[in-house]
Amino acid sequence: MYTTEEKARIRWACRRGMLELDVVVMPFFEECFDKLSEQEQRDFVSLLECDDPDLFTWVMGHGRSENLGHASMVDKIVAHNLSKVR
């Protein structure tokens, strides 16, 4: 479990250098983070340490992370955002 202060830091890390990532990562954090398992939360936090170009490539489906935790988390982020447009 993350403390309120740690979650505030994670929320800040969701703010990316690319607007395209902001609109998919931040809503996922706000709406789903607390529902994730502890391992999934760790994977999400680890994913935020990745470079924006890599994260953008994965979210857009033009590549896939070799890190299985990251790949799984990207799948969850994409699925969450797709569910909002259907």
UniProtKB/Swiss-Prot annotation:
Q: Does the keyword ATP-binding apply?
A: no
- Record-linked Pfam families: Sdh5
One biological process term from GO is: succinate metabolic process
Mostly located where?
cytoplasm
Q: Which InterPro entries does its entry note?
A: SDH, SDH_sf, SdhE_FAD_assembly_factor
**Localization in the cell:** Cytoplasm
Keyword vocabulary terms for this entry: Chaperone, Cytoplasm
User: Keyword Transmembrane, does the record have it?
Assistant: no
Q: Name one GO cellular component term.
A: cytoplasm
User: Any idea what job this protein has?
Assistant: An FAD assembly protein, which accelerates covalent attachment of the cofactor into other proteins. Plays an essential role in the assembly of succinate dehydrogenase (SDH, respiratory complex II), an enzyme complex that is a component of both the tricarboxylic acid cycle and the electron transport chain, and which couples the oxidation of succinate to fumarate with the reduction of ubiquinone (coenzyme Q) to ubiquinol. Required for flavinylation (covalent attachment of FAD) of the flavoprotein subunit SdhA of SDH and other flavinylated proteins as well.
Q: Which family does it belong to?
A: Belongs to the SdhE FAD assembly factor family.
Record-given protein name: FAD assembly factor SdhE
